[in-house]
Amino acid sequence: VCRNLNYTKAAEELCITQPAVSQHIRHLEEYYGTRLFVSEGKKMVLTEAGRLLQSAGLTMRHDEYALKELMARVGATERSLHMGATMTIGEFVLPSMLSRYMLRAPEASVHVTVANTSDLLGLIDEGKLDFALVEGYFSRQDYDYQIYSTEKYIPIAGARYQTRAGMNDSRRIRTEDLLGEALLIREKGSGTREVLERILEGKNLSVRDFRKLHEINNIHVMKYLVQEGHGISFLYEAAVRQELDQGSIREIPLKDFNVEHDFYFVWRKGSIFGGEYKEIFKQLKDKE
């Protein structure tokens, strides 16, 4: 019901009648002594109490899956981790991190899913992932977290690319001066994209304000197209460090763009496995 905000759709998913769904909600409201949903016109809206109950339910579901797997492995020497990472982290940060962890914990069996932030959070909610490393935004009310690192987020172009506003005078060029360029951007749901959208929103701009928009869900393809002069992009410095060092990609100097963003280690808020996840994170982060 929380997901659909509609009794009929919830009943169809659960294969029960709509009155049965309504009755279950009434029983819950009576038990907790508060409204879980209210009507605003023709819309059903989740109350704050309803949101808290939904969050607690998702945490319980996550812990149930994790506990079931843990129980199945009682007596086994092998440790099994199900972790996720966003594409930037998965391709440019995670490999060395995992290598260090595997050397320290050779008994561990690691299962890694690389996807965008919204998909990873959904997999955590479903109990299919223990935790994830993400750069996108997430609800602090629903997830516990620790900061892994703080990374520069920069505008980039190919080595020989010239913007319509020029590229050499950082005292003059502003973000809005790039709107005449083609923009290569990640797909919706990507943390890398959401960071840019929020930055632009703070400047009363949008990705749709650029002359042309190319949506690409692969960072390597984006970097290749940038190198070939097909437009500009905004990526984490960690994702283009090699190309910057080689000179095939360069940072666009902007007067009004000096952005850093955190990479986060996240798990369900209130999880009974929170202490264990923190210990694993400590091992993953340790570079010695």
Write out the residue ranges for each language-model feature.
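Short helix-boundary/capping micro-motifs
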Residues: V1-T17
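A short LG(V/I)-centered, amphipathic sequence patch enriched
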Residues: K9, E29-L46
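Flexible hinge/capping segments at coil-to-helix
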Residues: Y143-K188
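Central regulatory/effector-binding core of bacterial HTH transcription factors
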Residues: E78-Q141
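Alpha-helical linker/hinge and terminal dimerization helices associated
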Residues: Y31-Y32, L53-G75, I280
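Hydrophobic hinge/microswitch elements
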Residues: N116-T117, D125-K128, L205-E251
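A late-sequence structural motif
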Residues: V221, R250-E288
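Secondary-structure junction motif
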Residues: A182-N204, F273-G275, F281
